[in-house]
Design a protein with these regions (language model features):
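Catalytic core of DAGKc-family lipid kinases
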Residues: 2, 6-125
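Glycine-rich phosphate/pyrophosphate-binding beta-alpha loops
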Residues: 78, 128-142, 207
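Gly/Ser/Thr-rich active-site loops/lids in small-molecule metabolic enzymes
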Residues: 88-95, 137, 143-164
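Short acidic/glycine-rich loop or secondary-structure boundary segments that cap or lie
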Residues: 78-81, 120-122, 135-138, 162-165
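Histidine- and/or cysteine-centered catalytic micro-motif in compact active-site loops
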Residues: 74-75, 115, 125, 129-134, ...
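Glycine-rich, charged/polar anion/phosphate-binding loops
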Residues: 95-99, 108-116, 137-142, 177-179, ...
């Protein structure tokens, strides 16, 4: 779905397009974030009804590339999860991927710049910029994020060690990680993010790169059949 949206998003001013999707992929975070039906037969019938809504996208501009995203963009240990999880999905698969990836984990030096005090400079396990509440196979990284409010949610997992990551990992499925004093979050329409030493970046669950990134909310940029 990310590839389709990136194909039509640049044309929205001159040739606006409406996207319809039947989701069968890993994690199905798009269903959770966008309100799509999970059952493919019901989803096809719903598409035929032609009900169109507007949803926000995030736009990430980095060295030589500009891409929009639906769920989120991030770097650090979350990208290691994507690399380890491969093509399969589901919570157990992602949990196993994180546990396996802990031996490769190294914290990065991160800089986050946003308005009104939304800033971070220091060691971070991950920096995640979320348009929707779910990513990574059902993880509720930003529980209050919405795809119709014109805002992005940034979540910084501070300098967590391997033992802390293993302990706090299960809590991301209900948003409990936000209770950790090393985790910070902010909401705004635009952020600048840089990470030194990040081994990989992910966008909507797929590996990509590079840094630094200027990330902005694109309010109502996606016309979607639901």
């Amino acid at each position: 779905l990310n590839e389709v949206v990136n194909g039509v998003a640049p044309l929205r001013e001159s040739h606006p397009a409406t996207v319809g999707a039947v989701m069968t992929g890993r994690g199905r975070d798009a269903c959770r974030n966008l309100g799509l039906l999970r059952d493919p037969h019901r989803a096809v019938r719903r598409l035929a009804e032609g009900h169109v809504v507007s949803r926000d996208l995030g736009l990430a501009a980095g060295p030589g590339a500009r891409r929009v995203f639906i769920a989120g963009r991030g770097g650090g240990v979350v990208a290691l999860v994507v690399r380890r999880a491969g093509a399969a999905g589901g919570r157990l698969r992602y949990l196993a991927a994180v546990l396996a990836g802990l031996r490769d984990y190294r914290p990065s030096q991160a800089v986050v710049d946003g308005p009104a005090g939304a800033s971070w400079t220091g060691e971070a396990a991950s920096v995640l910029v979320c348009n929707g509440s779910h990513l990574g196979g059902g993880m509720r990284i930003a529980p209050v994020a919405r795809v119709d409010d014109g805002l992005l949610d940034v979540v910084v997992l501070g300098g967590l060690g391997r033992a802390e990551l293993a302990l706090w990992l299960p809590t991301v499925f209900w948003g409990g990680h936000l209770a950790n004093r090393k985790v910070r979050s902010w909401r705004a329409a635009a952020f600048r993010v840089d990470m030194t030493g990040a081994s990989a970046l992910q966008v909507d669950g797929e590996l990509t790169g590079g840094l630094p990134l200027e990330i902005t909310a694109q309010a109502g940029a996606l016309r979607l059949l639901v």
